[in-house]
Amino acid sequence: MWIGPNTDIYTVTHPVNAVERRKYLAKVLPVTIGNDVWLCGKVTICPGVTIGNNVVVATGSVVIRDVPDNIMVAGNPAKVAKKLDKE
């Protein structure tokens, strides 16, 4: 796996509701990253996301949903930009 500079991988989230936030509740949601993945610079991976094998995440992308195998994603939020060859 390659990780570019200023890439953030988050695993903790908090409630949006103010009353719940005051209770200091936090939820840990693991991030899973497959093989042969390239996270370019300034990528943000949000809690609970699974990134498949042979994936490229373009510079500046914010990944809020799972990414399947053999895909390049880009944007905020990250969307499929291209299908990649398996090899």
Annotate the PLM regions.
Residues 38, 56, 72-74:
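Short-chain dehydrogenase/reductase
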Residues 40-56, 61-65:
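Beta-rich strand-turn-strand
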Residues 1-49, 76-77, 83-85:
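Flexible, glycine/small-residue-enriched loop-and-beta-strand segment within the central core
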Residues 62-64, 72, 80:
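Conserved hydrophobic/aromatic beta-strand scaffold that supports enzyme active sites
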